[in-house]
Amino acid sequence: SSAASDVYKRQLDQTQDFFMDGGKNVRPASDENVRNNIAGIGRIIQEANCDVQFLQEVDKSSKRSYFVDQTASLSSLIGGTNAFAVNYSSQYVPFPLPTIGKVQSGLLTLSSFGALKAERIALTGTYTWPVRVAQLKRCLLVERVPLEGSDKELVLINLHLEAYDDGDAKQIQTEELLKLLTTEYEKGNYCIAGGDFNQMFSEVDATKYPLIDSSYWQAGTLSSDILPEGWRFAVDDSAPTCRLLNQPYSGDRAKTQFYVIDGFIVSPNVEVEAVHVIETDFQYTDHNPVKLEAVLKK
């Protein structure tokens, strides 16, 4: 079986920057811009030809994406089942100027397998009231796929961990993720978790995508030491998985801050055959998809 994490962040394409990353903009220039980017992302999804897609930051009804229902556009692409878990829902986000306004956004999992059930599991956040009212409520989207001739399940977890915190929330959320994964594995289930960890991986060569300016957002590092024996990260650093949105992307790689923060965790009974970043040159979004090909061990 194969699974892919296609990670999309507000469909901010090559021409965009974003205020939280040091840029100026809150949203793309027009709804046409949003629709073009969604169409481009759709083509990438279809070309990747995966059984499962983990998508993050998919808007259902948000001012920032001109109220285009992206879940509807993307859900029809590969057939099978789809599940959506909201992690950002606010009637009005009062910052910056112009304001973000209404947001309804979350995680979308597309599966050609047909899942038994899908469940939203809340993760611990560290924002306090009133700030948390206008912040993301991080979660995991967990799907269970029955396996023929077995009482075990394939447990698929779509994730997007905290971004702009001091590191505490990410650490807590990572621990919560690992606790869930190990519990499922101990039942004999097969586990694949994937998405945007907002952290670099210790397997990645840190000199490949160094911090080029000390004022830029710096990702913490996820050490493989935190994984129980036999578990592994499935990541690839042949291309970056994300760019900083402090400025539009000119294609000048020397002046662009890159990261490898997207990938997978797999249980010991899942054999990784290949994992690679699909290089899209950030044409439609500020993340590159990561494709995992894996086999469930008998």
Where are these regions (language model features)?
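N-terminal, active-site-proximal structural segment of metallo-dependent hydrolase catalytic domains
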Residues: 1-95, 99-104, 298
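Conserved beta strand-loop-helix elements of the APE1-like EEP
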Residues: 75-78, 102-118, 145-146, 255-271, ...
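Conserved S-adenosyl-L-methionine
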Residues: 82-89, 118-124, 275-278
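Active-site beta-strand/loop signature of hydrolases that rely on acidic residues for catalysis
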Residues: 2-6, 37-67, 110, 143, ...
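A well-ordered secondary-structure block
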Residues: 91, 95-154
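Metal-dependent phosphoester-hydrolase catalytic domains
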Residues: 144, 168, 179-192, 198-298
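Surface-exposed cleft-lining segments at the edges of enzyme active sites
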Residues: 24-30, 58-60, 124-133, 160-168
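Solvent-exposed loop/turn segments at secondary-structure junctions
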Residues: 9-10, 59-62, 88-92, 115-116, ...
